[in-house]
A protein has these predicted regions:
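Short linear sequence motif anchored by a di-proline
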Residues: 1-106
Length: 106
């Protein structure tokens, strides 16, 4: 997952949410689990290390990593995300979006 993304919709998953064009780790984000929708802090910590605060994982190694073995699945709503490219000493953000408007989450 990217390090910054956009939620410009006011009620994703029927939750009251203040739109942001710069959602960053540790902010509250709207998610949908199998049974309900809720706002949670964007980060992930395994049960055995509460202060790990991960924000992404590789799908191809997720099943083998001890950090993610007990993780529950969710859907994260978004309107788009940023990927950064370096040009010399400068980092330039490029905005991307997709039709699905959802990330897979843990």
């Amino acid at each position: 997952m990217c390090g910054r993304f956009v939620i410009s919709s006011k009620n994703p998953f029927d939750l009251e949410y203040t739109p942001s064009y710069n959602v960053t780790p540790s902010q509250l984000i709207p998610i949908k689990t199998k049974h309900r929708s809720k706002l949670i802090k964007w980060s992930y910590s395994p049960l055995w290390k509460k202060d790990m605060n991960l924000i992404n994982c590789r799908s191809e190694s997720m099943k083998e990593k001890p950090s993610f073995k007990e993780a529950k699945r969710c859907i994260i709503f978004h309107d788009g995300w940023y990927e950064w490219q370096r040009k010399g000493k400068e980092k330039i953000p490029f905005y991307h979006s997709s039709k699905s408007k959802n990330f897979a989450g843990l």
